[in-house]
Amino acid sequence: MEKMLLKSTTRHVRIFTAEVVDKELQFHPNKLTLDLDPDNEFIWNEDSLKKINQKFKELINERAGRDLDDYELRKIGSEVEGLIKFLLQNGELSYNPDCRVMNYSMGLPKTNELL
Protein backbone atom coordinates (compact mmCIF):
# COMPACT_ATOMS: atom_id res chain seq x y z
CA MET A 1 0.00 0.00 0.00
CA GLU A 2 1.39 3.38 -1.00
CA LYS A 3 1.92 5.82 1.83
CA MET A 4 0.60 9.31 1.46
CA LEU A 5 1.32 12.58 3.15
CA LEU A 6 -0.86 13.21 6.19
CA LYS A 7 -1.56 16.66 7.51
CA SER A 8 -3.32 18.40 10.33
CA THR A 9 -4.39 21.99 9.87
CA THR A 10 -5.68 24.43 12.45
CA ARG A 11 -5.88 28.19 12.11
CA HIS A 12 -2.30 28.71 13.29
CA VAL A 13 -0.68 25.26 13.10
CA ARG A 14 -0.05 22.97 10.16
CA ILE A 15 1.66 19.62 10.67
CA PHE A 16 2.78 17.36 7.84
CA THR A 17 4.26 13.84 7.72
CA ALA A 18 7.00 15.21 5.53
CA GLU A 19 10.33 16.93 5.38
CA VAL A 20 11.30 20.00 3.39
CA VAL A 21 13.56 19.19 0.44
CA ASP A 22 14.51 22.01 -1.93
CA LYS A 23 11.70 24.15 -0.46
CA GLU A 24 9.12 21.44 -1.21
CA LEU A 25 7.33 19.06 1.16
CA GLN A 26 8.24 15.44 0.52
CA PHE A 27 6.50 12.59 2.31
CA HIS A 28 8.59 10.99 5.04
CA PRO A 29 7.01 8.35 7.29
CA ASN A 30 9.27 9.16 10.26
CA LYS A 31 9.40 12.95 10.22
CA LEU A 32 6.97 15.73 11.01
CA THR A 33 7.18 19.29 9.75
CA LEU A 34 5.56 22.15 11.65
CA ASP A 35 4.31 25.23 9.77
CA LEU A 36 3.56 27.77 12.46
CA ASP A 37 1.29 30.79 11.96
CA PRO A 38 1.18 30.65 8.15
CA ASP A 39 -0.87 33.88 7.98
CA ASN A 40 1.58 35.83 10.20
CA GLU A 41 -1.19 36.74 12.61
CA PHE A 42 1.25 37.04 15.53
CA ILE A 43 4.52 38.75 16.32
CA TRP A 44 6.92 36.03 17.45
CA ASN A 45 9.97 36.39 19.65
CA GLU A 46 12.72 33.81 20.22
CA ASP A 47 11.36 32.77 23.61
CA SER A 48 7.83 32.05 22.38
CA LEU A 49 9.16 30.16 19.33
CA LYS A 50 11.39 28.13 21.63
CA LYS A 51 8.41 27.21 23.82
CA ILE A 52 6.35 26.14 20.80
CA ASN A 53 9.16 24.02 19.36
CA GLN A 54 9.87 22.45 22.76
CA LYS A 55 6.18 21.55 23.21
CA PHE A 56 6.04 20.14 19.67
CA LYS A 57 9.06 17.92 20.37
CA GLU A 58 7.58 16.77 23.70
CA LEU A 59 4.30 15.82 22.01
CA ILE A 60 6.16 13.87 19.34
CA ASN A 61 8.34 12.09 21.90
CA GLU A 62 5.25 11.10 23.91
CA ARG A 63 4.01 9.28 20.83
CA ALA A 64 7.29 7.54 19.99
CA GLY A 65 6.72 4.05 18.60
CA ARG A 66 3.06 4.68 17.80
CA ASP A 67 1.60 5.17 14.36
CA LEU A 68 1.07 8.83 13.63
CA ASP A 69 -2.34 8.86 11.99
CA ASP A 70 -4.42 11.93 11.23
CA TYR A 71 -6.13 11.70 14.64
CA GLU A 72 -2.80 11.87 16.49
CA LEU A 73 -1.65 14.74 14.28
CA ARG A 74 -4.85 16.66 15.11
CA LYS A 75 -4.25 16.11 18.82
CA ILE A 76 -0.71 17.46 18.50
CA GLY A 77 -1.96 20.46 16.50
CA SER A 78 -4.69 21.21 19.04
CA GLU A 79 -2.22 21.15 21.92
CA VAL A 80 0.18 23.47 20.10
CA GLU A 81 -2.77 25.76 19.28
CA GLY A 82 -3.64 25.78 23.01
CA LEU A 83 -0.10 26.83 23.89
CA ILE A 84 -0.30 29.68 21.38
CA LYS A 85 -3.46 30.93 23.11
CA PHE A 86 -1.77 30.60 26.52
CA LEU A 87 1.24 32.62 25.33
CA LEU A 88 -1.05 35.29 23.88
CA GLN A 89 -3.13 35.55 27.07
CA ASN A 90 0.04 35.87 29.17
CA GLY A 91 1.46 38.64 26.99
CA GLU A 92 4.33 36.49 25.69
CA LEU A 93 2.94 36.77 22.16
CA SER A 94 1.06 39.59 20.46
CA TYR A 95 -1.11 40.11 17.41
CA ASN A 96 0.61 41.43 14.30
CA PRO A 97 -1.00 44.77 13.37
CA ASP A 98 0.33 44.33 9.81
CA CYS A 99 -1.49 41.02 9.36
CA ARG A 100 -3.62 40.70 6.23
CA VAL A 101 -6.82 40.39 8.32
CA MET A 102 -7.20 41.43 11.96
CA ASN A 103 -9.87 39.12 13.33
CA TYR A 104 -8.46 38.45 16.81
CA SER A 105 -9.03 34.73 16.34
CA MET A 106 -7.83 33.98 19.86
CA GLY A 107 -9.73 36.74 21.62
CA LEU A 108 -9.32 40.46 22.01
CA PRO A 109 -5.88 41.63 23.12
CA LYS A 110 -5.51 42.49 26.78
CA THR A 111 -4.83 46.15 27.40
CA ASN A 112 -4.66 48.19 30.59
CA GLU A 113 -8.05 49.71 29.74
CA LEU A 114 -9.66 46.26 29.62
CA LEU A 115 -8.04 44.87 32.78
Curated annotation (Swiss-Prot):
Top-level EC class as recorded in UniProt: translocase
Gene Ontology CC entries for this record: plasma membrane-derived thylakoid membrane
EC number: 7.1.1.-
Cellular localisation: Cellular thylakoid membrane
Function: NDH-1 shuttles electrons from an unknown electron donor, via FMN and iron-sulfur (Fe-S) centers, to quinones in the respiratory and/or the photosynthetic chain. The immediate electron acceptor for the enzyme in this species is believed to be plastoquinone. Couples the redox reaction to proton translocation, and thus conserves the redox energy in a proton gradient. Cyanobacterial NDH-1 also plays a role in inorganic carbon-concentration.
Record's bilayer topology term: Peripheral membrane protein
Molecular function terms from GO: oxidoreductase activity, acting on NAD(P)H, quinone or similar compound as acceptor; quinone binding
Pfam families in alphabetical order: NdhM (PF10664)
Gene name per UniProt: ndhM
UniProt source species: Prochlorococcus marinus (strain MIT 9215)
Subunit organization: NDH-1 can be composed of about 15 different subunits; different subcomplexes with different compositions have been identified which probably have different functions.
Domain of life: Bacteria
Keywords annotated in UniProt: Membrane, NAD, NADP, Plastoquinone, Quinone, Thylakoid, Translocase, Transport
Catalytic activity: a plastoquinone + NADH + (n+1) H(+)(in) = a plastoquinol + NAD(+) + n H(+)(out); a plastoquinone + NADPH + (n+1) H(+)(in) = a plastoquinol + NADP(+) + n H(+)(out)
Family stated for the protein in its record: Belongs to the complex I NdhM subunit family.
Protein name: NAD(P)H-quinone oxidoreductase subunit M
